[in-house]
């Protein structure tokens, strides 16, 4: 839908004269022209197509027409027109009561409905002539139709822009891999998903033992302070890499007891 300033230009009403010529012989009351103006707005600027009269809520198979159907204004007090847009059905209903015309637009799918009340006697001084003669304030009427009747139910332009944005091509390789679990880890320690990283602030001692691929360090295989040089590389703490040296403290050999065993007094006890 064009903006309000565009609606006031002659280009906006281009095509109205053709529509008016097809219905002017049938126009019998001023409210007919107000309904015809809604029809023009729907078909010319919102790409609706009329599929007949009535209030049947069944979506028809035909594509519809830009022209008003036969018998569209046969009833003296009401109007019922059916439209389709993008395979969705809409009903345009009008009721004449106490000199006013109440118009409703109903979206059959979403059940959204809008309404507007206009005064035919005030807005339509003549039923014959050009658009500026029969409806001098046609631009203002169109703006009211758009704001009060169409926008609450149908936002065609906004919907099209959203669809184009959603369907815009994505760069190659941007599609997610359904078999991929999380991002790959680049170096550092391996922490299974069920473990909290460093829960008590301790270093990552033993974390490497949890990694079946051997990433993230040596795990529990490290040198003790009491055995600083146990051989090349990390060694198991429970199985020293080299033979025991009895002359080095802390690596086996005879170590006298500090307390005398009962009833035992060997010569070497000190």
Swiss-Prot record:
InterPro entries the record matches: PI31-like, PI31_Prot_N
- Specify the effect of residue 96 to E: Fails to rescue null mutant phenotype
Q: Where does the record say this protein resides? A: Cytoplasm
Swiss-Prot/TrEMBL GO biological process terms:
male gonad development; male meiotic nuclear division; positive regulation of proteasomal ubiquitin-dependent protein catabolic process; proteasome-mediated ubiquitin-dependent protein catabolic process; regulation of proteasome assembly; ubiquitin-dependent protein catabolic process
Q: MF terms per GO, please?
A: endopeptidase inhibitor activity; proteasome binding
Cellular component GO terms held in the UniProt record: cytoplasm; proteasome complex; sperm individualization complex
Q: Which domain of life is it from?
A: Eukaryota
Deleted gene: phenotype:
Larval lethal. Mutant larvae develop melanotic tumors.
**Record's comment on post-translational modification:** ADP-ribosylation by Tnks increases its affinity for assembly chaperones PSMD9 and PMSD5, sequestering them away from the proteasome Rpt base subunits and promoting in this way 26S proteasome assembly. Also interferes with its inhibitory effect on 20S proteasome.
Mutagenesis or variant effect for residue 243 to A = Does not affect interaction with Tnks
Q: Which Gene3D superfamilies match?
A: 3.40.1000.30
What's the protein called, per UniProt? Proteasome inhibitor PI31 subunit
- What keywords are assigned to this protein? ADP-ribosylation, Cytoplasm, Developmental protein, Phosphoprotein, Proteasome
- Which stretches does UniProt call biased (Polar residues)? 158-169
Q: What is its main location?
A: cytoplasm
- What Pfam families does this protein map onto? PI31_Prot_N
Q: What does this protein do?
A: Plays an important role in the control of proteasome function. Inhibits the hydrolysis of protein and peptide substrates by the 20S proteasome. Enhances 26S proteasome function by promoting its assembly through the interaction with the assembly chaperones PSMD9 and PMSD5. Functions together with ntc to control non-apoptotic caspase activation during sperm individualization. In testis, is required for proper protein degradation and germline cell cycle progression.
Outcome recorded upon mutating residue 241 to A: Abolishes interaction with Tnks, PSMD5 and PSMD9
Q: What are the start and end residues of every segment in region (Disordered)?
A: 158-270
Look up keyword Cytoplasm and say if it applies.
yes
The UniProt entry annotates the motif HbYX motif at: 268-270
């Amino acid at each position: 839908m064009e903006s309000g300033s565009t609606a006031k230009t002659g280009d906006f009403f281009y095509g109205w004269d053709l529509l008016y010529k097809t219905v002017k012989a049938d126009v019998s009351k001023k409210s007919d022209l107000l309904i015809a103006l809604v029809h023009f707005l729907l078909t010319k600027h919102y790409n609706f197509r009329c599929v007949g009269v009535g209030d049947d809520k069944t979506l028809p198979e035909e594509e519809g027409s830009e022209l008003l159907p036969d018998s569209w204004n046969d009833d003296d007090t009401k109007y019922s027109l059916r439209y389709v847009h993008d395979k969705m059905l809409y009903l345009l209903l009008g009721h004449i009561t106490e000199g006013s015309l109440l118009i409703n637009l109903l979206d059959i799918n979403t059940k959204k409905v809008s309404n507007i009340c206009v005064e035919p006697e005030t807005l339509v001084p003549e039923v014959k002539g050009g658009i500026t003669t029969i409806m001098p304030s046609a631009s203002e009427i169109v703006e009211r139709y758009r704001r009060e009747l169409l926008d609450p139910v149908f936002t065609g332009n906004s919907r099209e822009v959203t669809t184009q944005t959603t369907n815009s091509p994505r760069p190659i390789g941007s599609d997610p891999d359904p078999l991929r679990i999380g991002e790959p880890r680049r170096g550092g320690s391996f922490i299974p998903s069920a473990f909290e990283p460093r829960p008590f602030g301790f270093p990552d001692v033993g974390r490497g033992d949890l990694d079946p691929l051997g990433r993230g360090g040596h795990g529990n295989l490290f040198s003790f302070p009491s055995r600083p040089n146990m051989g090349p590389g990390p060694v198991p703490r429970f199985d020293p890499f080299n033979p025991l040296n009895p002359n080095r403290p802390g690596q086996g050999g005879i170590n006298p007891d500090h307390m005398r065993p009962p009833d035992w007094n060997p010569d070497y006890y000190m």
